[in-house]
Amino acid sequence: PLTEDQIHAGRPHVSNFGYAYAKRMLDVQSRAYRQQYGCNFITAVPNNLFGPNDNYDLNNSHVIPAIMRKMHEAKVNNKNVVLWGDGTPLREFTYSKDLADILLFLLEHYDEPEPINIGNTKEYSIKEVAEMIAEITGFTGEIVWDILKPSGQHRKPSDGSRLVELGWKQKDYKDLRKSLTETYKWVILKYPNLRGIV
């Protein structure tokens, strides 16, 4: 798992190049402001986020909103869903409402220049998540895995032990299925007026 002291080590995976460097530069900027101006900035490094108000643009959204939108539209139009890769890569997912709770927790419990990994460190395969979203959305068509498209890095585990040492507990995370269900209820309420569609 990626520990906080490894954030700047080596080149990021090509599939995550820009995003990884952006996280690194935010850490540099946070430390510089802390050092030069005495700002109590911290660098909280999340993993894969999802939830209401996410970006549902199929060209640049994260995996959960992309799958959720594809399955919703396929269900409505009675079509199959094509997903990239083979579905085997493992990812950690954190609900946006959990992220908000963690950030409030950090305001009271963390004031250090070193970055801190935040987010649920339980791993799920993309296939598991897709099947869960299919059940939640009521999608009954076929999920076609396009193995000619990239699957991405197989794993991107993060070490959340520093957050745990501060008192955050695994039980403080909302259940993935419940969080996906809440998110889909929001999608139904807002569709088609979702960010990335309109």
Give the ranges of each region predicted by the language model:
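Catalytic helix-loop patch of NAD(P)-dependent Rossmann-fold dehydrogenases
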Residues: 1-43, 48-50, 54-59
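C-terminal substrate-binding subdomain of Rossmann-fold SDR/epimerase-dehydratase oxidoreductases
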Residues: 73-198
